A protein has these predicted regions:
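Conserved N-terminal beta1-alpha1 strand-loop-helix module at the mouth
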Residues: 2-7, 11-110
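A C-terminal functional module that forms or caps the active site or interfaces directly
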Residues: 237
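Short acidic/histidine-rich active-site segments
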Residues: 258-265
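Alpha/beta enzyme core
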Residues: 54-58, 62-89, 96-98, 107-116, ...
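Short helix-terminating capping/connector loops at secondary-structure junctions
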Residues: 50, 168-169, 290
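Structural signal for hydrophobic packing residues in well-ordered secondary-structure cores
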Residues: 49, 82-85, 226, 278-285
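C-terminal helical cap(s) of enzyme catalytic domains, especially alpha/beta-barrels
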Residues: 251, 266-298
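Thr-Gly-centered strand-to-loop micro-motif
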Residues: 232-234, 260
Length: 299
């Protein structure tokens, strides 16, 4: 039997002096530092990252695509990616009992909305859990998917705003998966991606995931649009070298890491490819060194 970790009580702080009640100046904050921070929020962000770098492996695809490769025996996959260096794994709430015995020291994120590939509109994500339900499932954070530019953008903005409010009361971090998607929207356009990540910050998220613009130079325009840590989506599975090159380019463009699903959990060696990605994110390795770290002959 597993038991959710309980935070130590937050100490009662002395009443601040008048000048300490002023809000911090944006000009004095470092890039990619969350504006609001409590002890509980900071502790939970530490559980899903390492030194403010993120290797998150989302495995919520079962609700979207069914029991695809890598998710049938999700316990083994979770064990492999966490041994490979994943900072956190992510699932829907119903998978929580299968996660906790297998995630080693990794953090756990519960995703709280979904759609399916066989439904009428995959962009129409519906709420599947609340922040409180996520806490009961043992989550260290919650995540929410919003398609900026889609027909469903208005209600998704409202739902994300409600989630950030509820989560903030619990000291629970929110990862906003903010994609540029919709009629006439280029999902790799740095301006559209920059708009998406800024929206996430404006609505109160703590970390934001978005698509990759294709190279580090253009991705810099995305990361400079927000003070939140920006992590990139992995997209469909490529070669090992393509995956490593994408991660290296994103990090060079100011990313704080990745939230990479199929490229890791559907790999023939999830532990090895996780080690490759981790080497770039956490050790600042180049592509060849990262491939060697994962044990791949492509190096």
């Amino acid at each position: 039997m597993w038991f959710p970790r309980i935070d130590p009580a937050v100490p009662i702080l002395a009443k601040p002096s008048p000048n300490e009640t002023d809000l911090p100046s944006i000009a004095t904050q470092s890039h990619n530092e969350p504006f609001h921070m409590t002890a509980g929020l900071a502790a939970r962000l530490d559980r899903i990252s390492t030194h403010d770098r993120y290797l998150i492996v989302p495995m919520d695809h079962g609700i979207t695509m069914g029991a695809v490769k890598g998710l049938v025996d999700i316990e083994s996959t979770i064990d492999g990616v966490t041994r490979g260096g994943a900072d956190a794994v992510l699932t829907q709430k119903g998978i929580a009992p299968r996660v906790h015995p297998n995630k080693n020291d990794a953090g756990y994120i519960v995703h709280v909305n979904a759609s399916t590939t066989i439904g009428p509109d995959e962009n129409d994500k519906r709420v599947t859990a609340t922040a409180e339900e996520a806490v009961r499932a043992g989550a260290d954070a919650v995540s929410f998917h919003i398609n900026v530019g889609s027909d469903h953008e208005p209600e998704q903005i409202e739902e994300l705003a409600e989630l950030t409010d509820d989560a903030s009361r619990l000291g629970l971090p929110v990862l906003a998966m903010a994609y540029a998607r919709g009629p006439g929207v280029d999902s790799t356009d740095p301006e559209a991606l920059g708009h998406a990540v800024r929206l996430a910050e404006e609505v109160g998220a703590d970390v934001v995931k978005t698509g990759y613009s294709g190279d580090g130079d253009t991705f810099t325009r995305v990361t400079e649009s927000t003070r939140l840590p920006v992590v990139i989506a992995g997209g469909s599975k490529g070669t090992d070298r393509e995956t490593a090159e994408m991660v290296r380019g994103a990090m060079d463009g100011g990313a704080a890491g990745v939230s990479m699903g199929r490229s890791i959990f559907q790999h023939d060696d999830p532990e090895g490819i996780a080690r490759t990605v981790s080497a770039i994110i956490h050790d600042d390795a180049d592509v060849d060194a990262a491939l060697q770290a994962g044990g791949f002959s492509d190096a």
